[in-house]
Amino acid sequence: MHFPNHEAAFKVIAEYLTDKDFGVIKSTSEVKYIGHRVVHGGKFTTPERVTPAVVEELRKVIPLAPLHNPASIIGIEAAQKIFPKETEHFVVFDTAFHQTMPEKAFRYAIPNHFYTEDKIRRYGFHGISHKYVDARTRRHFNNPHLKNITLHLGNGASMAAVNEQGHCIDTSMGFGPNEGMLMGTRCGDIDSAVVFFLGKKGLSNDEIAKIFNHESGMKGI
């Protein structure tokens, strides 16, 4: 099914939910809460109720997740238009689970001011998935104190190390969701010299980003 925009998609969702034959509710007024997954939460470490201030913070970190956060913001705003004003919206972040990483795990070995001023550090992604897998593993083995290595395997792929307390202490993805494992169309770890080399060949930053994000990984090889 093709939709021209997010708002049109949410209209169809609302119609299905309230359909007289197979719907599960009579009116969209029965929808009290809507949850939105957002890839990059920046400074946020816990789920947040959507407010104008929260959306503004998500806009600030668009440069850190340019392929994901803009669509998330559009989706949030579309849902707010289609569903009643009384419906509360919440955001959960892929980066939040990894905020317990120690500094030795999240810092890059580059000049300090890039961290303090530009917030260049390893954030990690797929945190919602890693947290779920870790929790299910502990329940499955009836052991709340396991040390786990969790994997998220899809077109994007990542690993995380979780300690006995259920806190992430390291992960394979970093500043963006391109670092780490070889993925479907993303290159994963690559020598920074390759970036300089491609730049000298005349490729722009946008062209290099397109290659690394959409034309590499399993597709590339």
Segments from the language model and where they lie:
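A mobile "lid/hinge" subdomain adjacent to the ATP/sugar-phosphate binding pocket shared
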Residues: 200-221
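Buried hydrophobic positions in well-ordered alpha/beta secondary-structure cores of metabolic enzymes
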Residues: 34, 94, 165-166, 212
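A gly/proline- and charged-residue-enriched helix-loop-helix capping module
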Residues: 57-75, 79, 117-121, 125, ...
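Glycine-rich phosphate-binding loop of actin/hexokinase-like ATP-binding domains
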Residues: 97-200
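Short beta-strand-loop/turn "lid" adjacent to the catalytic site in phosphate-handling enzymes
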Residues: 17, 23-68, 88-90, 96-105
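A structural motif corresponding to the C-terminal end of an alpha-helix
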Residues: 75-89
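Short glycine-rich, Thr/Ser-proximal phosphate-binding strand/loop in the N-terminal lobe
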Residues: 1-3, 174
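Conserved active-site and cofactor/substrate-binding residues in soluble primary-metabolism enzymes
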Residues: 4-8, 53, 70-74, 124, ...
